């Protein structure tokens, strides 16, 4: 049921319409060769943490340049914490392949979602993925808006969220970029695909 709602919420309810939309706009405003930091100027993310950790750090945010500068990063975005495909397939694909990603020289694997850092923290702990993956909240969606990866999932009772996507970024430059046709899809954004692209 949730998958059907997500698919319906994606662009007039038609997967074909969603595919045509992606094709006509080149997937997103960024792609291979783009500088991810320049594409989202002034944007910072909030690292997943408990409320007490937030207080202790004055609710600090992390600028994108600090996340990507001088590093090889695999980053993936998803519609939301505690949702079906995200919990059952997307995050586990990266958690289960972390050693293979590190063996390819990846410095960090990052999950970003339009959520607050506290919900992400609880979710990451529930998935036992915090040791393998860094989780960041894009609480107001500004990062995903800047990349043209925002989607309205109000029909699935989620509001404005992120499309499901992944990228390999080397020192801020996008080397590989994958976006699913619908947020409920899980065909091109998993770790198995990005491993072949590094």
Curated annotation (Swiss-Prot):
Gene Ontology molecular function: thioredoxin peroxidase activity
Active site feature: 86 (cysteine sulfenic acid (-soh) intermediate)
UniProt-annotated location(s): Mitochondrion matrix
CDD domains linked to this entry: PRX5_like
An example Gene Ontology biological process: hydrogen peroxide catabolic process
Keywords linked to the UniProt accession: Antioxidant, Mitochondrion, Oxidoreductase, Peroxidase, Redox-active center, Transit peptide
Enzyme class per UniProt: oxidoreductase
Thioredoxin domain ranges (all copies): 34-198
Transit peptide (residue range): 1-27
Reaction(s) catalysed (UniProt annotation): [glutaredoxin]-dithiol + a hydroperoxide = [glutaredoxin]-disulfide + an alcohol + H2O
Pfam families: Redoxin
EC number: 1.11.1.25
Gene Ontology CC entries for this record: cytoplasm; mitochondrial matrix; mitochondrion
UniProt-listed InterPro entries: PRX5-like, Redoxin, Thioredoxin-like_sf, Thioredoxin_domain
Oligomeric and partner information: Monomer.
Protein role: Thiol-specific peroxidase that catalyzes the reduction of hydrogen peroxide and organic hydroperoxides to water and alcohols, respectively. Plays a role in cell protection against oxidative stress by detoxifying peroxides. Reduces preferentially hydrogen peroxide rather than alkyl peroxides. May be involved in mitochondrial redox homeostasis.
Additional remarks: The active site is a conserved redox-active cysteine residue, the peroxidatic cysteine (C(P)), which makes the nucleophilic attack on the peroxide substrate. The peroxide oxidizes the C(P)-SH to cysteine sulfenic acid (C(P)-SOH), which then reacts with another cysteine residue, the resolving cysteine (C(R)), to form a disulfide bridge. The disulfide is subsequently reduced by an appropriate electron donor to complete the catalytic cycle. In this 1-Cys peroxiredoxin, no C(R) is present and C(P) instead forms a disulfide with a cysteine from another protein or with a small thiol molecule.
Family per record: Belongs to the peroxiredoxin family. Prx5 subfamily.
Identification of the protein by name: Peroxiredoxin-2F, mitochondrial
Species annotation: Oryza sativa subsp. japonica
């Amino acid at each position: 049921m949730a998958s059907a709602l997500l698919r319906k919420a994606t662009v007039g309810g038609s997967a074909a319409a969603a595919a045509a939309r992606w094709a006509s706009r080149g997937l997103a405003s960024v792609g291979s060769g783009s500088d991810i930091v320049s594409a989202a100027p002034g944007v910072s993310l909030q690292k997943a943490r408990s409320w007490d950790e937030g207080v202790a750090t004055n609710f600090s945010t992390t600028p994108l340049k600090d996340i990507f500068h001088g590093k090889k990063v695999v980053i993936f975005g998803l519609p939301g914490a505690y949702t079906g495909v995200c919990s059952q397939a997307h995050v586990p694909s990266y958690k289960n392949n972390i050693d293979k990603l590190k063996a390819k020289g990846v410095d960090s694997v990052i999950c970003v979602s339009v959520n607050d850092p506290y919900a992400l923290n609880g979710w990451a702990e529930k998935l036992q993925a915090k040791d393998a993956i860094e989780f960041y909240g894009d609480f107001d969606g500004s990062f995903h808006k800047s990349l043209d990866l925002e989607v309205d999932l109000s029909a699935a009772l989620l509001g404005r969220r992120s499309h499901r996507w992944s990228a390999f970024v080397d020192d801020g430059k996008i080397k590989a970029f994958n976006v699913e046709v619908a947020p409920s899809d899980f065909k091109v954004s998993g770790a198995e695909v990005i491993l072949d692209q590094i």
